[in-house]
């Protein structure tokens, strides 16, 4: 698939209309598609530089601040309208309720996720309680963020990486890398490293390196994101009806892991047909 479909806002949470659309990114699955992206960019702007970041496999949210104080948080929803989940976002410890600079207004975008260690603890508790366990950290993060009781969300060990400034008043920024450094200064969690390259071969090398580290990370990623760094160049490039033209997401192939065959169960159908079913030791993908 080349388009990630967003969810509609649920009636049980107050709807939030995003004043700046929370866009999705065009996906690429090959080096050839990435080079096509670079050619399109080079055809419109001179000497672009690209920031490369891991693509966190979580839930995209908007955080809003007035005079430096957190006032509202919402899900992406369909990009135009999301859900108000402020109460549940407030209990995520890595989300600052007050930032260092009392900016008149700030809206940032981030990805809420459940670290592997938290996921294992939550699943253990579910199994002990006889509940159906979450299938993966992304589902667990989604279920936890949409709890009606924020005290339950607080026990789930959620975290966030903030990766974009949607709107800002009281500060002028000129590039994506500058904005990420500023987000760190304000007190937000960002990814540890966000290198910036003019040489597209180095961009491709970085994407490969992120993929190699994928299995060692404490959180799930499903790709890497390439973004034009300069904000003026982004304005020139603009957007299609669906995606910004200044960014693209490279999607890694699904992870493969070895497991152990525990048993083979044979089921006999009504007509006597034997159907074997393999019982495998569970692994986290």
Q: In which residue ranges do the predicted regions lie?
A:
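RNA/tRNA-interacting regions in translation and RNA-turnover enzymes
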Residues: 1-285
